Amino acid sequence: MGTRSGVKTSRRKTARLAVNRRSQIVRTFIEILNVVKLYHWKTRSYAEHKATDELYERLNENIDKFVEVYLGKDESRIKYWERRVEVVQPENKTEFKAKIYQYRDFLKGLTRKFTSPSDSDLLSIRDDILSDINQFLYLLTFAK
C-alpha cells in the first residue's frame, strides 16, 4: 500500500514540475517579446526600428506556434502563470544585444529539456526562433 501511495505522489510531483516548466518557458517567451517591442519603440535608429519590428513579427508567430504545439502534446492549458513577468527595458543597444544573447542561450538550453524524440517538433520550431534571432543579430551590424 505504501508503494501505491508513493507512485501517486510521484505522479503529482511530476505533473507539478511539468506545469512549472511550462509556465517558466511561456514567461520567458513573453519577456523576449516585451524586450524586443520596448526596444523597438525606444530606438532612434530607423534601421534598428525596422529590424526589431520584423523580429517581433517573426518571434510572435513562432512563439505562438511553439506554445500551441507544446500545449497540444497533452491537450493542456496553462493553469498557473508565473506571478511576475519581468519587464526589461534595455537602456542602449549594448544592453539590448546582451539580453538577446541571453535569450538565445535560453533557447539553446531547451535541447536539454526536450530530449524525447517526440519533442523534435518543438525543437524544430525552436530552431526557427534561433534562426530569426541570429539573422536579427546580423542585421544589427548594419545599424550604426
Predicted segments — roles?
Residues 24, 28, 51-54, 58, ...:
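Alpha-helical initiation/capping and key positions within long helical/coiled-coil segments
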Residues 31-54, 113-118:
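Helix-loop segments that flank and shape redox-cofactor active sites
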